[in-house]
Amino acid sequence: MPQYNDSVRSSDKQNWSASRISTYRQCPLKYYYTYVKKWRCSKAPDTTAADKGTCFHETVEHFKTGMEHAKLYEILESKIKEYNVDTTKYDEKAALERFFLFWNEFVAKSELTGFKTLQEGWASGDLGGEHFIGALDLCLDRGDRIKIFDYKSGKTPSISKYKDQLLLYSYLKGQERGWDFQQISDNVKLYLFFPMSEQKTAVTDEDKMLASVKEIKYDATVLQDCINNYLETIQEIKAHDWENEDLDALGCPDFACCWCEHKGGNPNAEGYKGCKASRDLGNVQERYVTYHLKESK
């Protein structure tokens, strides 16, 4: 997976990302614990669901047109062991087979028309003076045209919750060329690929692959509105007086709480306030679990 290194920027210039913004929009309390005070939990989070996606990503990032498929299967086997993926529950091999079909259709054919392929790269740029970064699973670039693909490991292909993330990427890549909103919407295409999605109506493997790829349609107005919303969210975050916030009122429990390390967390003497919203719903953290501040580098 890519490691971002931006040593040129001063240390007081914080990086923003789609995930950081979505964390705040989803739950301001989790944002506070993750980005403001950086509280960490002694209990290792359950990453079972995420590991299947990581296993896939860290396998396919090695692929290039013309590479023997057998080599990628070898990498997949090692990644399955590394992440202890339950292959009876998550069919990584079937996902890889679908990936090969995807690559032939969307990547290899594009390369024949002049597109250059970049896997696991970065997009970065400024939005209203705020520095944003984003990790790109796959970017096809011809200079005058760009295609961005993001891999998702969900069973159901859904565009809505990832749309803002991909729109941000399109803006950052277009900004590198000095394109305006109209030029970006004309020249940057956005796609989501769901290699593990269930396709019950598609007949052939090719059909299932095609049904697993979703294009995000947008125009200049949609893109501009999205970027403005990002900037408005940042201003809202900066307007918080975090040191004097009523943290009990910040929690926003929803389905995502099941993956949150702060679910059911109790206050401690070190200043950790826990999550009252999740405790009120009956969630209780185990007694042995503790919370501590992440050490500053």
Model-derived features with residue positions:
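RecB-family 4Fe-4S metal-dependent nuclease core
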Residues: 1-297
